């Protein structure tokens, strides 16, 4: 695959860009719109930041893990992960303990309050997702999932090339 795939495109495609139909722009706008609607739930109603919510969900999905594993699973950078963990710990939603194999490492686990908070928020954000997707048939939702996975893979390929 060439270093810069766009170099293969005809010149008119390289110089004529219409923002409203430019896929990266449309994806960012859509992601922002959806994210703001969902953030309203966990931020305004439950006083969580976006990184705190993502870390909380990662802990539900992964169980007791290190901060590094939370960061990797939720695509948060180290600083955001650290702040999210600190914030959740201060709010009583998680606790840190020394790792058995190396006391310098910490294992992070949800508290009962953290699990309870997740159980309150998850149905609300899942209802938002259901609302967004109910305009599609089951086949269309399946196709959308395949298309998104394809775009994610291509974006990862582009990142590796750059």
Residue ranges and their predicted role:
Residues 28-39, 43, 67-71, 77, ...:
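A broad helix-preferring feature
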Residues 34-41, 74, 117-133, 151-162:
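Alpha-helical linker/hinge and terminal dimerization helices associated
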Residues 3-8, 73, 86-146:
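Charged, amphipathic alpha-helical coiled-coil/dimerization segments
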Residues 1-16, 139-162:
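C-terminal regulatory/oligomerization modules of transcriptional regulators
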Residues 18, 36-80, 160-162:
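N-terminal helix-turn-helix DNA-binding core of bacterial DNA-binding proteins
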Residues 32, 57-61, 122, 149:
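Short, locally clustered residues in the helix-turn-helix/winged-helix DNA-binding domain
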Residues 1-46:
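N-terminal leader segment of winged-helix/HTH proteins
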């Amino acid at each position: 695959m060439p270093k810069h795939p766009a170099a293969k495109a005809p010149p008119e495609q390289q110089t004529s860009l219409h923002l409203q139909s430019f896929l990266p722009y449309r994806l960012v706008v859509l992601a922002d719109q959806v994210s703001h609607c969902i953030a309203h739930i966990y931020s305004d109603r439950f006083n969580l930041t976006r990184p705190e919510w993502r870390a909380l969900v990662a802990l539900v999905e992964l169980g007791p893990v290190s901060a590094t594993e939370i960061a990797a699973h939720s695509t948060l950078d180290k600083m955001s992960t650290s702040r999210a963990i600190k914030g959740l710990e201060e709010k009583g939603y998680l606790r840190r303990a020394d790792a058995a194999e190396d006391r310098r490492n910490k294992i992070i686990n949800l508290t009962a309050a953290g699990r309870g908070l997740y159980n309150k928020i998850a149905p609300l954000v899942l209802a938002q997702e259901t609302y967004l997707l109910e305009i599609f048939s089951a086949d269309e939702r399946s196709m959308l999932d395949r298309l998104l996975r394809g775009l994610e893979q291509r974006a990862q390929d582009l990142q590796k090339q750059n």
